[in-house]
Amino acid sequence: GGGKIYQVRAGLFNDVDVVLEWHPDDRNSARPGTTLANMSAKFRFRGVSSHAAADPERGRSALDAVEAMDHMVNLLREHVPSETRIHYVITNGGLAPNVVPAFAEVYYYARHPSMPVLDDIWSRIVDAAKGAALGTGTTMEFEIVNGVYNVLPNVYLSGLQQKSLERV
């Protein structure tokens, strides 16, 4: 989970070379598996509200910006390594269909086995958001929610941990 991020920020691992972790399961076991590096953020777009039928040309739809970003990121999927996972959900798309929404928000996750590769993919996602804002006449800001490196497993230490767990 993301709890270790707060421990790192507090300096609890400054003098630590190795961390043994164990996740609760239906049995006591230590597996030397890894995880995917993960980045997540909420992208917020702001535009100009107007009535969608009476005065649509005055509007600058924040929802259009979200949809443009989503479309560009969906096109990006073809051009990233196959191990990449990109997920999103529109968390705010306006309140009424007859009003051009002045605010919209989309929440993105991106995952990959390698943080350096994920960093490149993430910058492309952010660029898609910037391009969507530019193309729709809106503004964009984003808030990083989480960022987690992939776990680097140690087979030898996992074996020692497994032996200890078997004694429990």
Sequence positions of predicted segments:
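Metal-dependent amide/peptide-bond hydrolase catalytic core
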Residues: 63-168
